[in-house]
């Protein structure tokens, strides 16, 4: 049985851990509130640019563009959004597991795919498995701006435009609520889903439709990446908040259990001392 000193040491250590996890929970809650607002604020912009792009692409004249048309697939790109830090429950492991299983199922050779990764956790995961990472970015702020992601987004879209990739998929955690995040797979390029937009507005084009699409489509694809990043950041903070809350609750439960054990051990020690004193007194009589 553990000594009173050992139990007391464990209680003090667990209390310190509880204080740390509680502080991290509060920090994550604050970050989540702002990240959630950022993600929600970006939705109207995305809805409007999607409407405009769809109308330009599918309007009168039916202009075609390489970013809108499916082509034979020789190489696939995977854009994976993870975090730079851990302590976020299954936030990273869920999305990485899905990507890894998908790649193993679809491809027989590393020559058939390449990975663009956002976040140190994902970068470490793929490098340890010798999987081809063609682009990466780490150390993004907790509340990233479009400027923070613009360069890698531009390069990612460029890899499809120059024929390096024939299709591009994006994997991230979609924010549903503070207690629910869903791993999401989205086909980023080609933009074949624009045909699903039923709303139509007639535009007069100046310059030509094709020239407008040359500018609009890359911007739209880059905006999709940024929108997914905002979504993923909200999910990250929510997952970390939940993980730290669970850790705090578990620590407090352990403290209660250890305190009970400490009191029982202390009571047993006192009882033993009293018994020995009484026995000694009786022996003297």
From Swiss-Prot:
PANTHER family, A to Z: ATP SYNTHASE GAMMA CHAIN, ATP SYNTHASE SUBUNIT GAMMA, MITOCHONDRIAL
Oligomer status and interactors: F-type ATPases have 2 components, CF(1) - the catalytic core - and CF(0) - the membrane proton channel. CF(1) has five subunits: alpha(3), beta(3), gamma(1), delta(1), epsilon(1). CF(0) has three main subunits: a, b and c.
A GO molecular function held by the record: proton-transporting ATP synthase activity, rotational mechanism
Main location, first listed in the record: membrane
Gene from which the chain derives: atpG
Protein's name according to its UniProt entry: ATP synthase gamma chain
Extent of the signal sequence: none
InterPro entries: ATP_synth_F1_ATPase_gsu (IPR035968), ATP_synth_F1_gsu (IPR000131), ATP_synth_F1_gsu_CS (IPR023632)
Taxon lineage: Bacteria, Bacillati, Bacillota, Bacilli, Bacillales
Membrane topology value: Peripheral membrane protein
């Amino acid at each position: 049985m553990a000594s009173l000193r050992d139990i007391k040491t464990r209680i003090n250590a667990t209390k310190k851990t509880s204080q740390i996890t509680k502080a991290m929970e509060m920090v994550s809650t604050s970050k989540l509130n702002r990240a959630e607002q950022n993600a929600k604020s970006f939705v109207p912009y995305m809805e409007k640019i999607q409407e405009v792009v769809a109308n330009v692409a599918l309007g009168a004249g039916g202009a075609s563009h390489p970013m809108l048309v499916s082509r034979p697939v020789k190489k696939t790109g995977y854009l994976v959004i993870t975090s730079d830090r851990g302590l976020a429950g299954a936030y990273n492991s869920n999305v990485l597991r899905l990507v890894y299983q998908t790649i193993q199922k679809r491809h027989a050779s590393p020559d058939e795919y390449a990975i663009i990764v956002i976040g140190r956790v994902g970068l470490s995961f793929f490098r340890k498995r010798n999987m081809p990472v063609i682009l990466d970015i780490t150390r993004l702020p907790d509340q990233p701006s479009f400027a923070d992601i613009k360069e890698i987004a531009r390069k990612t879209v460029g890899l499809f435009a120059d024929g390096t990739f024939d299709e591009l998929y994006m994997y991230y955690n979609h924010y549903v609520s503070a207690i629910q995040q869903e791993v999401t797979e989205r086909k980023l390029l080609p933009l074949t889903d624009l045909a699903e937009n039923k709303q139509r507005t007639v535009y007069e084009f100046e310059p030509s439709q094709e020239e407008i699409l040359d500018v609009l489509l890359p911007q739209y694809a880059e905006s999709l990446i940024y929108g997914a990043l905002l979504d993923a950041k909200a999910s990250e903070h929510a997952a970390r908040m939940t993980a730290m809350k669970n850790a705090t609750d578990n620590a407090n439960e352990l403290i209660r259990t250890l305190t009970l054990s400490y009191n029982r051990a202390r009571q047993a020690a006192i009882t033993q001392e009293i018994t020995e004193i009484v026995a000694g007194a009786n022996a003297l009589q």
